[in-house]
Amino acid sequence: MTTPTEFQFTDYQPYDFANRRHIGPSPAEMTDMLKVIGFNSLDGLIDATLPPTIRQKAPLVWGAPMTEREALDKLRETANKNKVLVSLIGQGYYGTITPPVIQRNILENPAWYTAYTPYQPEISQGRLEALLNYQTMVCDLTGLDVANASLLDEATAAAEGMAMAERVSKSKAKAFFVDADCHPQTIALIRTRAEPLGWSVIVGNPFTDLDPVDVFGAIFQYPGTHGHVHDFTGLIARLHQAGAISVVAADILALTLLKSPGEMGADIAVGSSQRFGVPVGYGGPHAAYMAVKDAIKRSMPGRLVGVSVDARGNRAYRLSLQTREQHIRREKATSNICTAQVLLAVMASMYAVFHGPDGIKAIAQQVHQKAVLMAKGLEKLGYKVEPESFFDTITVDVGHMQGLILRAAVAEGVNLRKVGETKIGMSLDERTRPATLEAVWRAFGGNFTIADFEPSYLLPKGLLRTTDYLAHPIFHMNRAESEMTRYIRRLSDRDLALDRSMIPLGSCTMKLNATAEMLPITWPEFSDIHPFVPADQALGYREMLDDLTEKLCAVTGYDAFSMQPNSGAQGEYAGLLTIRNYHIANGEGHRDVCLIPTSAHGTNPASAQMVGMKVVVVKVRENGDIDLDDFRTKAEEHAASLSCCMITYPSTHGVFEETVKEICELVHKHGGQVYLDGANMNAMVGLSRPGDIGSDVSHLNLHKTFCIPHGGGGPGMGPIGVKAHLAPHLPGHPETDGRPGAVSAAAFGSASILPISWSYCLMMGGEGLTQATKVAILNANYIAARLKGAYDVLYKSKTGRVAHECIIDTRPLVDSSGVTVDDVAKRLIDCGFHAPTMSWPVSGTLMIEPTESETKAELDRFCEAMLAIREEARAIEDGRMDKINNPLKNAPHTVEDLVGEWDRPYSREQACFPPGAFRVDKYWSPVNRVDNVYGDRNLICTCPPVESYAEAAE
């Protein structure tokens, strides 16, 4: 019998989120990694990596870090301060039912929400098919030829529609007409977009105030924000006669019952797909849509999924016409948008797949019937209801009773819309119940039930839809939930996301999106709040926004933040507008020159162009640093008109430049402001603050540094932080402070995903965030050290260090073996990895960012794969392997390759199970290498006909 030993207390913390859950390497592994790099301590590595001049003086501190349970309790306490009423406010945001099969298997599934933008098509086939379904759905419902894979929100899409109209219009006019019945936030964003570009905006009644000769385009709301349903066919014909372009902002659910914009002759249709199963979420995120006529498709902004073939001739999907995008076209791009809303577009497309055309039409009919019943009840009470015909929205003039009725409705648990000083509006939706109608009638003084009225239709007969939609078999095959679940699973199995392996994309920060951070976004206290509810119903949101703002200010050294921008690119746009407005307020509106280094993100020059700035390009030295002499020369040359500079720190080359403070001082000396792109903030948190370095404004990518998942290409969040002197010029919003300058449809952007970043901050604490930054730098330097000798690291600091990412040079392989960077990327798929960022910021290179969340084992697996690829290239160099028919040129290999006839001069095992690949759980690419040229030359952007599915199966 053993003698009991004395009980020993331990300091082990099983629920230490920062060190045990978020940060990948253990302390012992960090010690081993540091030895490989040549350091005895993590702090020693950090001291050698960051210039002392940019280090922050005080540590990042804010309370003790919380455990997951403590953080969730805090989130629950905060969420309970929001009041969840039934909101009939409408105005572009409507109650909807998210089918549980979609919520559980897509919204809450890391296979969908942790994926990256599908720039590597072979490992994105599932997402690309879902997005092709989305584009098909939009084309069918709008009656137009080509749709993109989503935009940020409806108001942004409308502003993009205006910009596109100006590009393709034959008119020389510099004015754009806006239907006064557009949603107020849409009008606000159009004004914001137009003003810096010198376009005037005319708001009025299109049937009385529009002269097509005076404008390059016009936008009409269909149905209108107050419910009117008009046929714009005649107006559109008149616009075309004058060489102008027509844009129709259409309710996607109404289009199941109403004549499509395409049938009216519209050139462009925009709108939101939110009411296809995506919660309102206090403003977002939601997927906006844009569809256009075929003749103008190459001028359309955003991503476009198309059909191509792979190396075997099998059908494959890819992003088409990428040369339009900002990362290639820079200031000549159609837009600065590089973020779509993929996760939300996928949800909306699956809503259509789940319900099919009959189901969606039935939902629309039921919504309309509810609106008719509501109108009948109000008319019985003696109120005049407008308009006479409508889809889901009505307006009632109640005179001096407005305030009393609005308060009475709130007491009944219902929010109605305040319209002017005497009217009340209401929009019925999928979630409206009979009890809600009866509650509204009581607020108006009635006391009857829904059984007192007969349902009927009040849609204008001349506008009833007669054309089919959603005819493709995909919208008819998944009625049973068993089939729907399997379809979603089949698609997700075709993709490679963070739930399978690390995604080492440079400048993308694909870190852990912890489950505890994700849980609150589906709580109704966050997801079911309309963005325009009275302030006292969103006190929980207010508390969270204030605390997150305070934390972000502490991280950055800024004094104020705007949470409005829905993406990093939109943050750039908002930040540059803030700078522009600051100069105008100081009587220096002539300052319009923006200095941008050649190494900058492509969004930087595209954003500068959007706010009317002139881009002056600054050279970069051979070592990757900004050429200080060239910068000084150009700053002095343009001193009288210098507005700002845009720099990224650490640089896009993955190095902390030592001259950054001097650059900031030069800009300030000549009257400009400094915009520091926050894309690489994951290398700075807790160690260095942009506001201390000399920057005036930055955006933060919350979908990078602060754990919001990339969602396969969106959602994102790009809030901007500013120093105090710029704070008065931050974006306003018509529904909050009434100030101009709105950049998003909702005042706080995609507010419902902010709990992710907030809970990350709560669980990490200041010390944990700082440690995460240090480990991100450690992991990048470890990879650089492991790959040394096989690949050159292109840029290092004077001390031989990289920041949180490194660029390896694969260009020598082209001359020695014929192996391209594309070959390396596709071979990594065979190893089970998403490729690092390809050919940016330097063509023919790979930029690797491992983040702090990856374990040493995963880093080693990646390094083994990269080293094995180098050995395969060496075999080609030595003549041991054919220069054309080899594993690199034929990658990725599929199951079809494995089981088919094999006539290649290397083995099946070498092809399919290279070092780094799992044998039991191997990821198999569903297609061989995709033919990009074929896809652009034979552009198909909707679901292929059913015959092609049969052909593909043969």
Curated annotation (Swiss-Prot):
Gene3D superfamilies given in the database record: Aspartate Aminotransferase, domain 1, Type I PLP-dependent aspartate aminotransferase-like (Major domain)
Cofactors: pyridoxal 5'-phosphate
Presence of keyword Cell membrane: no
Record's keyword terms, sorted: Oxidoreductase, Pyridoxal phosphate
GO cellular component entries: cytosol; glycine cleavage complex
EC class of the enzyme, as a word: oxidoreductase
EC number: 1.4.4.2
Pfam families: GcvP2_C (PF21478), GDC-P (PF02347)
Chain positions with N6-(pyridoxal phosphate)lysine modification: K704
Domain of life: Bacteria
Catalyzed reaction equations: N(6)-[(R)-lipoyl]-L-lysyl-[glycine-cleavage complex H protein] + glycine + H(+) = N(6)-[(R)-S(8)-aminomethyldihydrolipoyl]-L-lysyl-[glycine-cleavage complex H protein] + CO2
GO molecular function terms attached to this record: glycine binding; glycine dehydrogenase (decarboxylating) activity; pyridoxal phosphate binding
Matches recorded under InterPro entries: GcvP, GDC-P_C, GDC-P_N, GDC_P, PyrdxlP-dep_Trfase, PyrdxlP-dep_Trfase_major, PyrdxlP-dep_Trfase_small
The keyword Oxidoreductase is assigned to this record: yes
GO aspect biological process, one term: glycine decarboxylation via glycine cleavage system
Similarity field: Belongs to the GcvP family.
Assembly description: The glycine cleavage system is composed of four proteins: P, T, L and H.
Role this protein plays: The glycine cleavage system catalyzes the degradation of glycine. The P protein binds the alpha-amino group of glycine through its pyridoxal phosphate cofactor; CO(2) is released and the remaining methylamine moiety is then transferred to the lipoamide cofactor of the H protein.
Protein name: Glycine dehydrogenase (decarboxylating)
Organism: Rhizobium etli (strain CIAT 652)
Gene giving rise to this polypeptide: gcvP
